[in-house]
C-alpha cells in the first residue's frame, strides 16, 4: 500500500563558488529568461506538458496559434507554451487550453 508522506525538512549542500562568477551567471540566466518568456504578463508558466518527441510550444507555434485569444486569456506571442492573462477568467483559460489542444491534435496528431 502506498503511503502519503509530507517532506518537512531538507538539507542542501552546494559547492563553494566565486561571488562574481555566480552573480554573472544569475544575470545571464535572467537575461535569457526575459528574452524567451512573457515576463511582463501574469501567467502560470509553461502550460502544456511536453509531448514525447516534440515541444508543445513549437507545435502550438506551427499551428499558427501564437496570439490566439479567448476573452482575456491569450497564447503568448513571445513563447507559445505560455498562456498569459489579459484580464481573463478561469473559463477563458480553460476554453483557450481546450482550443489549443483541439487545433494541435487536428493539425499535428499530437495530444497536449
Language model: regions and residue ranges:
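Phosphate/pyrophosphate- and phosphate-bearing ligand-binding catalytic cores of soluble enzymes
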Residues: 1-95, 102-107, 111-112
